[in-house]
UniProtKB/Swiss-Prot annotation:
This is Chaperonin GroEL. ATP binds at T29, L30, G31, P32, D86, G87, T88, T89, T90, G413, N478, A479, A480, D494. Forms a cylinder of 14 subunits composed of two heptameric rings stacked back-to-back. Interacts with the co-chaperonin GroES. Belongs to the chaperonin (HSP60) family. The lineage of its organism: Bacteria, Bacillati, Bacillota, Clostridia, Lachnospirales. It is found in: Cytoplasm. Its EC number is 5.6.1.7. Disulfide bonds: none annotated. GO terms for cellular component: cytoplasm. It is an enzyme of class 5 (isomerase). PROSITE patterns: CHAPERONINS_CPN60.
Length: 541
């Protein structure tokens, strides 16, 4: 396939045009008075959103060289989203500013490699300044503010803060679409896993179709139970004690299941059987989690234990167990606190070591069930279009709060970059030649987020930047009220992780793009149209 090649300033100009087209589309969403972008979908209703990475992913340009530039910016947005979960629009705006400023200097004869070195030094200095300005998140109120700024909605902020407070940092918060118009928060206390009763005859409440066992014994095994004789001695002891039993096994089938159901219906004893959660090695780990949480033992051949030898003191205990068609929740397990703490730190260690995102997610879920809890935010809206937009904003808010808890917060609204630029200006004075020019590129780019926040509010960015520069650290411009205020006191906060990641990723891509001297793209070949009448005449067969 034939290729087209462009060199020097022509190649850079084409890439720069692609960067501008994508960045100009995304930057209209920045700030409290930012607008939305409507995205055409190949099926269903268009998507209306202000989420930078969602917009960036949709942009494909016709010109191959311009498209390469756009794809590079898309990488900045995606990488920032992966690391921090928010700040994608800021990262895009920073990249555009760096590319525009850098290209001017290259045309004036700057050396791109030395320029890049200066950009890297200035970025490191700015990141250091951002970290120095950071403060730890204090209380639920600040968490709510971080979420509200990210989503542009106070109600969302309060909901996310409630969820974070209830499940703690180890908990898992998931976001789902609601069946109603209301947005609500559901909290699952205790250990929940997605397996339900093996037979509806085991229900204790036929109206709700669920089985509730108070203070039950819990048999945990990775074996199949098909012969009732295997667990008969144990069942007799349970009946004598007048207790209830939850069986968690690989499966309960045949004669064993029939006998359990018949005795349940006769009222001989109250028993519920569920399948073990997970598969393979993950199943073994989850059964071990349940055993530690309830103070029982996993009856497994791996440990040399057989069902027929099981005694009552090998069983777990819990305050209550609720079993539905597809879920089981164990509340207040009777496990030893030290053993549970040991298991939690073991899972944390595995999370730190694993490189697989999938494994990390599953381990995080296990950690939440052991230590925190699981909260589900169900997002409701009048139409599907509004619901999808609200769900994206909710996800951004959740990611922003997690980032804030992790690395702390700083003044929001682009003002942190302005105050960090004072440190970069000091560095610029110590550099020489094109390194100095590279550092100045970053110095100029740090003004871009505040400039566009002001521009989207219909104000003159340059004037506002100068006023913020002259003010005390922590002071910034509140574009919603058009006032200069102490940003942290007024709840206009950004997570350091988001601010830092956006700057580092923008510099990484922009400095690499500026070192480009030639670009190669595939020439699109027009596919000839099918001649008229081709395919006709088949009826003659």
């Amino acid at each position: 396939m034939a290729k087209e090649i462009k060199y020097g300033s022509e190649a850079r100009a084409a890439l720069g045009a692609g960067v501008d087209k994508l960045a100009n589309t995304v930057r209209v969403t920045l700030g409290p008075k930012g607008r939305n972008v409507v995205l055409d979908k190949s099926y269903g209703a268009p998507l209306i959103t202000n989420d930078g990475v969602t917009i960036a992913k949709e942009v494909e340009l016709e010109d191959a060289f311009e498209n390469m530039g756009a794809q590079l910016v898309k990488e900045v947005a995606t990488k920032t989203n992966d690391v921090a979960g928010d700040g994608t629009t800021t990262a895009t705006v920073l990249t555009q500013a760096m590319v525009q400023e850098g290209m001017k200097n290259l045309e004036a004869g700057a050396n791109p490699i030395v320029l890049r070195r200066g950009m890297k030094k200035a970025t490191d200095k700015a990141v250091e300044a951002l970290k120095d300005m950071s403060q730890k998140v204090k209380g639920k109120e600040q968490i709510a503010k971080v979420a509200a700024i990210s989503a542009g909605d106070e109600e969302v902020g309060n909901l996310v803060a409630d969820a974070m407070e209830k499940v703690t940092n180890d908990g898992v918060i998931t976001i789902e679409e609601s069946k109603t118009m209301q947005t609500e928060l559901d909290l699952v206390e205790g250990m929940q896993f997605d397996r339900g009763y093996l037979s509806a005859y085991m229900c204790t409440d036929m109206d709700k179709m669920e089985a509730v066992l108070d203070d039950p014994y819990i048999l945990i095994t990775d074996k199949k139970i098909s012969n009732i004789q295997d667990i008969l001695p144990l069942l007799e002891k349970i009946v004598q004690a007048g207790a209830r039993l939850l069986i968690i096994a690989e499966d309960v089938e045949g004669e064993a299941l029939t006998t359990l159901i018949v005795n349940k219906l006769r009222g001989t004893f109250n028993v519920v059987a569920v399948k073990a959660p997970g598969y393979g090695d993950r199943r073994k780990a989850m059964l071990e989690d349940i055993a530690i949480l309830t103070g029982g033992q996993v009856i497994s051949s791996d440990l040399g234990l057989e069902l027929k030898d099981t005694t009552i003191d090998m069983l777990g205990r819990a305050k209550s167990v609720k079993v539905q068609k597809e879920n089981t929740v164990i509340v207040d397990g009777a496990g030893d606190k030290d053993a549970i703490a040991g298991r939690v730190s073991q899972i944390r260690g595995q999370i730190d070591e694993t490189t697989s995102e999938f494994d990390k997610e599953k381990l995080q879920e296990r950690l939440a069930k052991m230590a925190g809890g699981v909260a589900v935010i169900r997002v409701g809206a009048a139409t599907e279009t509004e619901m999808k937009e609200a769900k994206l904003r909710m996800e951004d808010a959740l990611n922003a709060t997690r980032a804030a808890v992790e690395e702390g917060i700083i003044a929001g609204g682009g003002s942190a970059y302005i105050h960090a630029s004072k440190k970069v200006a000091e560095l610029v004075d110590t550099l020489e030649g094109d390194e100095k020019t590279g550092a100045k590129v970053i110095l100029k780019a740090l003004e871009a987020p505040l400039y566009y926040i002001a521009a989207n509010a219909g104000l003159e960015g340059a004037v506002i930047i100068n006023k913020v520069k002259e003010s005390a650290p922590g002071t910034g411009f509140n574009a919603a009220t058009e006032e200069y205020v102490d940003m942290v006191d007024n709840g206009i906060l950004d997570p350091v992780k988001v601010t830092r990641s956006a700057l580092q990723n923008a510099t990484s891509v922009a400095s690499t793009l500026l070192t480009t001297e030639s670009a190669v793209a595939t020439i699109k070949e027009d596919t000839p149209a099918m001649p008229a009448g081709a395919g006709a005449g088949m009826g003659m067969m």
